[in-house]
Amino acid sequence: MAMARYAAFLRGVMPMNCKMPALKAAFEAAGFTDVKTVLGSGNVVFDARSGSETMLQQQAEAAMQDHLGRAFLTIVRSIDQLRKLLATDPYKPFKVSPKAKRIVTFLRGRPTAKLKLPVELDGARILTMKQGEIFSAYLPTPKGPVFMALIEKTFGKDQTTRTWDTVAKVAR
């Protein structure tokens, strides 16, 4: 079986609740190789024998439970898949303001919610969905990222969100 490069996006990780060297060690204990963390927010890139995203997610979560004493919801995508996503620029048709933050929400499964898009709430717009990803943009406000409540209400908590810039850093 050939090795492939993957990215794991973990929900709820921040430097205060998970040290990156410990996270890296947990992924290595899961049998993944060439493991690197990207930024301090739960982004891990690694090599693994090709397998289903679901299998890799379960493997990573089990290793975190064993080595960190807790598991973070993990969503895996292949690096090839992320590069294709970046190349398509799903924001292009929407005339997104240069000041807006572009964000991608990765879903654990396929979306079950039927939404007429784009949806707007307090300056945040959910623009489009493609398979397991939702693309949004918002202008930062003092209220913070209000769209997160809308995304959770619509798609549940089996998801995690990253900025477009973070996805680009992870896919490099």
Language model region names:
Residues 2-41, 45-172:
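Surface-exposed, charge/polar-rich loops and edge strands
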